């Protein structure tokens, strides 16, 4: 059995029991490796060295900077289970993507800045209900992510204009034209 001794000072357990103060006083660095039956048993440490080690441990336990990271970056909330049909199913009116849909979309290569609006979801559901195709829940979410990506990119990321609004004329005269 191999082991690593972390100090150059080694003593047998019998020698330590007979005169521990002298053994620790001669120890370089205030630490002695104590052997029993030719194997390391434990370390004997002087009170001064123990105080140094505890101070070092306390210093290392404190953060190195005053920047604190938000815990929610490390703790993902558990999504509440939703009754999703098993296997493949046709689109139905009450279908909803998962609560962590935006994160999942990012995993699929679709960066969505905003959550799905009710209008976008209603349009998606209406289209696919009419198609009558069947897919797994994850596949429906992937289709929704791609649909949102294409729909939002077609207008430069801006929401679609209402076709019923009356446009206002531009009253600015471009350079080079007379007014």
From Swiss-Prot:
Report which superkingdom the organism of origin falls in. Answer: Bacteria
Annotated Gene Ontology cellular component terms: primosome complex
The yes or no answer to whether the keyword Translocase is present is: no
Q: Which GO terms describe its biological process?
A: DNA replication, synthesis of primer
Q: What InterPro entries does the record point to?
A: DnaT (IPR020917), DnaT_DNA_bind (IPR040480)
Signal peptide (UniProt feature, chain positions):
none
Q: Name one Pfam family in it.
A: DnaT
**Carries keyword DNA-binding?**
yes
Question: What are the UniProt keywords, alphabetically?
Answer: DNA replication, DNA-binding, Primosome
Disordered as annotated region, ranges: 156-179
User: What NCBIfam families does this protein map onto?
Assistant: PRK02854.1
Assembly and partners are described as: Homooligomerizes. Interacts with PriB. Component of the replication restart primosome. Primosome assembly occurs via a 'hand-off' mechanism. PriA binds to replication forks, subsequently PriB then DnaT bind; DnaT then displaces ssDNA to generate the helicase loading substrate.
Q: Please state which protein family the record places this protein in.
A: Belongs to the DnaT family.
Task performed by this protein: Involved in the restart of stalled replication forks, which reloads the replicative helicase on sites other than the origin of replication. Can function in multiple replication restart pathways. Displaces ssDNA from a PriB-ssDNA complex. Probably forms a spiral filament on ssDNA.
Tell me the protein's name: Replication restart protein DnaT
- Source organism per entry reads Escherichia coli (strain ATCC 8739 / DSM 1576 / NBRC 3972 / NCIMB 8545 / WDCM 00012 / Crooks)
